């Protein structure tokens, strides 16, 4: 499997981005025990462009972690582009956009999985971020907003047309949050 120029082998093991979990020490431990690629905690684009020190610390990566991705989330195109450029300066191997977080403080404000209710804006942000940076851009999202709006097949094609290097699909809708059985049939 390749993402951009990064060859991850035939069946790579990924350490997903997890808030308050995937700090540098945890990422290094997971690399030691076989993770082929690791992600930082997700980073708020708004906090990043305001230079919030706790957020900036999430950009600290080391060569021992490589390949490593930094994941950002937000709802404003200009803010996401500015944040993407800041992230690129931290020299990750991949920039990942989170359109999958279902929690109210993110999705309720229109970011993360909240973007599943505004697909044109999601695509606008994705295109703008892809065009703004030189590193591969990937996206993480869900099957759709709810059981009546599972749009992932069409959405995947649209995101591919925006130029993303890879797509991670959470096998649940936003309405499911992290409960119920994941749908792996897509």
Task: Label every model-predicted segment.
Residues 1-186:
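Flavin-dependent oxidoreductase catalytic cores
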């Amino acid at each position: 499997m390749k993402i951009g120029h990064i060859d991850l082998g035939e069946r790579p093991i990924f350490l997903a981005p997890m808030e308050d979990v995937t700090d540098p020490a945890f990422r290094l431990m997971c690399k030691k025990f076989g993770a082929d690629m690791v992600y930082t905690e997700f980073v708020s684009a708004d906090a990043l462009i305001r230079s919030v020190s706790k957020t900036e610390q999430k950009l600290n990566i080391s060569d021992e972690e490589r390949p490593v991705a930094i994941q950002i989330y937000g709802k404003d195109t200009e803010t996401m582009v500015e944040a993407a450029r800041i992230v690129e300066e931290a020299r990750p191997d991949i920039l990942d956009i989170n359109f999958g977080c279902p929690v109210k403080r993110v999705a309720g404000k229109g970011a993360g999985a909240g973007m599943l209710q505004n697909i044109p804006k999601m695509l606008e942000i994705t295109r703008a971020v892809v065009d703004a940076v030189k590193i591969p851009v990937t996206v993480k999202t869900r099957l759709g907003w709810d059981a009546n709006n599972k749009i992932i097949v069409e959405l995947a094609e649209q995101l591919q047309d925006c130029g993303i290097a890879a797509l991670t699909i959470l096998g649940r809708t936003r309405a499911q949050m992290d409960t119920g059985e994941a749908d792996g049939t897509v």
